A protein has these predicted regions:
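Conserved strand-to-loop turn within each blade of WD40 beta-propeller repeats
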Residues: 14-17, 53-57, 90, 96-100, ...
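Short coil/turn segments that connect the beta-strands within blades of beta-propeller domains
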Residues: 7-9, 48-49, 90-92, 134-135, ...
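WD40-repeat beta-propellers
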Residues: 20-24, 44, 60-64, 85, ...
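A beta-strand-loop signature enriched in Asp, Gly, Thr, and Trp
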Residues: 112-177, 181
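Terminal intrinsically disordered, low-complexity extensions flanking WD-repeat/beta-propeller proteins
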Residues: 144, 155-158, 165-167, 175-176, ...
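Solenoidal tandem-repeat scaffolds enriched in leucines and small polar residues
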Residues: 32-116
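Canonical WD40 repeat/beta-propeller blade segments in eukaryotic WD-repeat proteins
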Residues: 1-4, 39-46, 80-87, 122-129, ...
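Short C-terminal beta-strands that terminate individual repeats in beta-propeller domains
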Residues: 30-36, 54, 71-77, 97, ...
């Protein structure tokens, strides 16, 4: 797992062996290596000076990166690998998703979850907090689930569901409008590996984007919120403009090379 600190100065890296590293990227310097996990670290989330990590060892670690004795707390609430973690600094809540199909909400550094959501029927890797409405959380389920679910984490109540018909790999809210972007893998139809844009709360579909030939595991939004980049197992990065009409992908890409193309979303 990889995750930038909020100011973009430090990069946290989770390794296959369970180590967590913090890098100063500008100086190309490894600042510290932290022990604790006993298996791969695939989920990482920052909350100011708190670095939270989730692992295949089923544990969630809270660490204070300012001090030598960094370990604050270990949480043992998932029965399988912790595959999704996202902090919401505005309401001091942490969402954790697991391969046990569970979505848990934690308040601050508490020992026990504030809410437990059991509705997903596959791993919950895709998690995204809305920047537009406090306590609004979206989560996406894997191949046996294929749903995006919305939650009010202030009340602990489920809100609405989108059945996407595809494995949900990643989610991100549009920074400038009340829309959510989802990336996908295996589909029950012939629409595999697509990217979809949904309007909230109407849940109407704004656009469907195709081009990747393997599941779209990675999704990042530009600081301005005007474009996104997606990465897939097909070894391509694709850049999408959020503000202009979608058009068909014309590129013929070499699957073995890392290439990028710029495409219009709508």
């Amino acid at each position: 797992g990889l995750n930038w600190s909020e100011q973009g100065q430090y990069l946290a890296v989770g390794t296959q062996s369970g180590l967590v590293q913090i890098w100063d990227v500008e100086r190309e310097k490894l600042l510290r290596t932290m022990l604790g996990h006993t298996a791969r670290v695939g989920a990482i989330a920052w909350n100011h000076h708190i670095l939270t990590t989730g692992s295949r060892d089923r544990n969630i670690y809270h660490r204070d990166v300012r001090v030598p004795e960094h370990h604050i707390k270990t949480l043992q609430a998932h029965r399988q690998e912790v595959c999704g973690l996202k902090w919401n600094a505005a309401c001091d809540q942490l969402a954790s998703g697991g391969n046990d199909n569970k979505l848990l909400i934690w308040h601050g550094l508490s020992d026990t979850p504030l809410h437990r959501f059991n509705e997903h029927t596959a791993a919950v890797k895709a998690i995204a907090w809305s920047p537009h409405q406090q306590g609004l959380l979206a989560s996406g389920g894997g191949t046996a689930d294929m749903k995006i679910r919305f939650w009010n984490t202030q009340t602990g109540k489920p809100l609405s569901v989108i059945d996407t018909g595809s494995q949900v790999c990643n989610l991100a809210w549009n920074k400038t409008s009340n829309e959510i972007i989802s990336t996908h893998g295996y589909s029950s139809s012939n629409m595999h590996n697509q990217i979809q844009l949904w309007r909230y709360p109407s849940l109407s579909q704004v656009a469907t984007l195709t081009g990747h030939t393997m599941r779209v595991l990675y999704l990042a939004m530009s600081p301005s919120g005007k474009s996104i980049v997606t990465g897939a197992g097909d070894e391509t990065l694709r850049f999408w403009d959020l503000n202009t009409p979608a058009r068909e992908q014309q590129d013929r890409m070499d699957d073995r090379s890392l290439q990028s193309s710029f495409m219009k979303l709508r």
